[in-house]
Amino acid sequence: VTAFDWYAATIRDDPATVVGTLCTALDASPVQMGRGMHGYEQSLELRGRDGVVARVLAGGVNPWPHAWASGDDTDAFVESVRGAWPDWHTVSRVDAADDFGGAGCWDRLLSECVSEAETKNLRIDQAGDWLRDGEHGRTLYIGSKSSPVRARLYEKGKQLRGDGVKDAPIDWVRLELQVRPENQAKWTLATASPSEVWGSARWSRTLSTRVLGVDVDKVDGRLWHEPDDVRAL
């Protein structure tokens, strides 16, 4: 099942309202972390019972706050943002992830990903221990770092074991699609499901069909029109 693994949004609302609403929804408290980045004045962590559940940048030259969450905290964050600001946030980054397991899983997925990359003449990069099949696992990247759409195939179980999670399944493999949308696609993906994120590029749609067995429609921000009151801001 495809799930969100990262969601970053610029929210068109007052920073104090954004922080307060998210803290209430996520059962968290804000902690000031000093100066922000990318022109923002403040950086805050929203901390729940088990740690940081979201982060917020606010103030400075940017009129609207920017917030994001990752990993297991993403779904609750997405629900909160879309529930409070369904028509008033844009997405700057969204990751969709699918998990696999079983004997031979890595080799099968690697073959499919490399085949698609070669067919579409996409850049391939590698990280991890490819020579010795080491315990820390391997990662395959499809697409360049600067591309709006990039995929990662990696041995999640081995990564977690290297991080101290000793009972993580050794054959756990994850395929992720990272999308940094441009122009009107920032609005389109603000309502997309995790599966629909795979429609962000021609090659990612094909990969979804080949690996996930799911046919998805093209994400085309040019077909989206802003409401008059949004365009006027």
Which residue stretches match the model-derived regions?
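Structured, helix-rich domain cores that form ligand/interaction pockets
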Residues: 1-231
